[in-house]
């Protein structure tokens, strides 16, 4: 197998509050991999956690890690016979399942136990992400999109795919009443996806007035402070008001509240990553026969997300708080970590 090596400038996390611009070699197989010059990236919660705490959930930083799993770019080189073309603009799916295990063969690649997810410290060695000048990926990871589509829109492909998968986990939403608890970037994209999927009423909650305002911009009919009991109490009357609750905050109180607010035979979709254990009113879930399902990453929804963004079916731009150059990555991470100021912060590479 022939290997090529190029110089690559990357945003590398070394430890707590230690992210640096590093010039390092990128070795790739030109006969097997697609070389993509990165144009833009979006900072996600996990990037912030690696920066602030050197860990994201159970994934602990043991070695330097190139951050980023939300990124798009322009193809620089392709293997002979590829369906892709040099100069084509692509969104890159950061998922790299094994495609051999029973789960993958059943079409459940998002829960593959050997998943190599770009920008993740789950495994050692870690899997580098896309906050760099170039990445080498498989052809299957590249989803082309139209030249006229805006980069700042298309870089939402990965988080919107998460939201679309959550909506798919809920089943048919046509005519349904929906609650979304937590109106951060993912919660707001769930709001937009639920509305697109036919929900007749979408209500959002968040403690932050800024987040509630964004929820309204992204399609919520109402946005409520969850501490305002005069607004939330009616949702528990008559056994529960909402057909589907999407829990996107990970906050224990919000997680528990979904059992009260969901009507009998309704569905709770857990999207937010909360603590390892939480208290849940199981009695309510039992007697109301509420179905609780998890939602983790995505499968085919990544391609769907690209098409929705490309066609303007969903406009994510209200969520963009700021843009920074690659060499301003520390400032970008600082702002992204300040939830009083930022929803989605983007990095511009080219």
What is each model feature region?
Residues 2-10, 256-257, 299-350:
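C-terminal hydrophobic helical "lid"/dimerization subdomain
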Residues 98-181:
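NAD(P)H dinucleotide-binding glycine-rich loop of Rossmann-like/cofactor-binding domains
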Residues 252-313, 348-350:
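Glycine-rich phosphate-binding loop and adjacent beta-alpha segment
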Residues 91, 246, 269:
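N-terminal Rossmann-like NAD(P) cofactor-binding module of classical short-chain dehydrogenase/reductase
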Residues 180-183, 195-257:
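Adenosine-nucleotide cofactor-binding segment
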Residues 27-41, 55-105, 146-149:
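Glycine-rich beta-strand-centered segment in the early N-terminal region that forms part
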Residues 187-188:
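N-terminal Rossmann-fold NAD(P) dinucleotide-binding loop
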